[in-house]
């Protein structure tokens, strides 16, 4: 008997058409591989989708692929991830469950003493007992685990599988994923397999009382940093597990995605003009046809602004050479003339406000309304305005002017200013 374990597909994350195709092709390859290998069931512990209700293009694709798996007689067991979670069951996950293409495994009951108990579902073909908890927003899943009735789950007999979505502090990883991590001890002991999601690199470890704690990693990319990892040789795919009364083997199955070209430039103690020249030289004669190109510029400029490092011409040249997409990373590029001081906060909005507060003193403007407290408030409002998502059925030629006009109105400007 065997099952497949995949996670963090993040369907709908990619905005560039070329990457959207790869995103879907990789997922399609995995499900086709599961059908070909005749797995008994599939586990997906979260972040199947990048948001709880993705655009219709993504939903149509997902429904077609899950129907094919369903028609092949392979059940799919899932929990929410932190991206596709919905507290009111208002997610495409729930639509897929409603039509019977997937099964949500979390069956939780809250008790008067504050404890939360979980029921195990039994896979009808193999007899495997499956349960788990969804990933929640803002690290609230830890509160659930602290209230979890672990003893009743540990008392269950037979081959048991626990699905979870979140970071485990005991697991050594360089995934760089943000968010709180919890100790492994919050999970029930004695399960045969712990199917993890959230961490984007493959990781398989066993501990005393916890055998086979496994993250398959993302099959392609759920963040821009994943593309860079892919380019640097990170293997992507899913996990195939053979079992009888116990787990017999855990194997990583690699699924290839695309070719990459990485261009790195060290800007430390250099002027922007020098960096621009090196970029032009490094990209002049390279073959980028049908490749994802990643340009990474890091270091501290000795003079000039980070904006003076202009990649627009280089990007155009690479696109003219038929690169699939050109992804530029300048988030580790700073300047001696202006450097951003980091700040902390209890939530996203507070962090943003604190960053503005820490850094606004470096700015010099002739307009006092752009400085001090008024400048901080304006910056926060502007960031919120620029971060608005497209409305349902809104086209780009409607979305862009709407956001532009709102931003100009905040600044007290108009199109002619």
Where are these regions (language model features)?
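Accessory, non-catalytic peripheral segments of nucleic-acid enzymes
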Residues: 245-417
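Short histidine/acidic/glycine/proline-rich micro-motifs that form metal-
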Residues: 48-50, 82-86, 300-302
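His/Asp/Glu-rich metal-coordinating catalytic cores
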Residues: 41, 54-67, 72-229, 233-242
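Glycine-rich phosphate-binding loop signature in dinucleotide/nucleotide-binding domains
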Residues: 34-38, 154-157, 286-288
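Acidic/glycine-enriched edge-of-secondary-structure segments
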Residues: 18-22, 50, 129-134, 257-274
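Structural beta-sheet core signal
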Residues: 5, 44, 78, 162, ...
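N-terminal active-site segment of His-dependent metallophosphoesterases
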Residues: 1-65, 71, 390-397, 417
